[in-house]
Regions:
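Short glycine-/polar-rich loops that comprise or flank the Walker A/P-loop
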Residues: 45, 69-74, 117-121
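Short C-terminal domain-edge/linker segments immediately following a structured domain
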Residues: 28-31, 79-80, 105-108
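Small/polar loops that bind or transfer phosphate-bearing groups
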Residues: 50-51, 77-78, 125
Length: 134
């Protein structure tokens, strides 16, 4: 829900003063808005692109529910180790708690087998194999 958070004027104002506090203040409101938009799309049968870390056990049930609504799910997982993610965050000059990076990675690795059983199509991409200095 990064794009939603970054579009909020309150986040932008807070970010200009202190990026860590801006993240801590606006992450949950952005997440709330993101899930509301997802629900709106599902209720209206819209095509949906849901970009997320998928590091939440609740997403197993979410994807099952989405499938029950007749949606096909195509999941693309970007294989990026916590070390790679932390480097990228530093280059983006965007705050995200480092301890959460590892926590999310561990959760995602644990959930991937379940996701692979649910989704219609699963792709694991490793862009770092073809690009230098990620």
């Amino acid at each position: 829900f990064d794009a939603i958070m970054e579009a909020l004027s309150g986040y932008q104002a807070d970010y200009s003063l202190d990026r860590e506090n801006a993240f801590l203040r606006w992450e949950l409101p952005a997440r709330f808005l993101g899930y509301r938009l997802l629900l709106l799309g599902l209720r209206n049968g819209w095509p949906i692109l849901f970009e997320h870390s998928n590091a939440l056990r609740e997403h197993v049930d979410l994807y099952k529910k989405i499938k029950s609504l007749g949606y096909r799910i195509h999941m693309v997982c970007i294989d990026a180790t916590p070390e790679m993610v932390i480097k990228r965050l530093a280059r983006r000059n965007r705050f995200f708690p480092e301890e959460q990076v590892k926590k999310r990675w561990d959760c995602l690795i644990d959930l991937l087998p379940e996701y692979q059983k649910i989704v219609d199509d699963f792709k694991l991409i490793q862009p770092w194999k073809n690009v230098e200095n990620l």
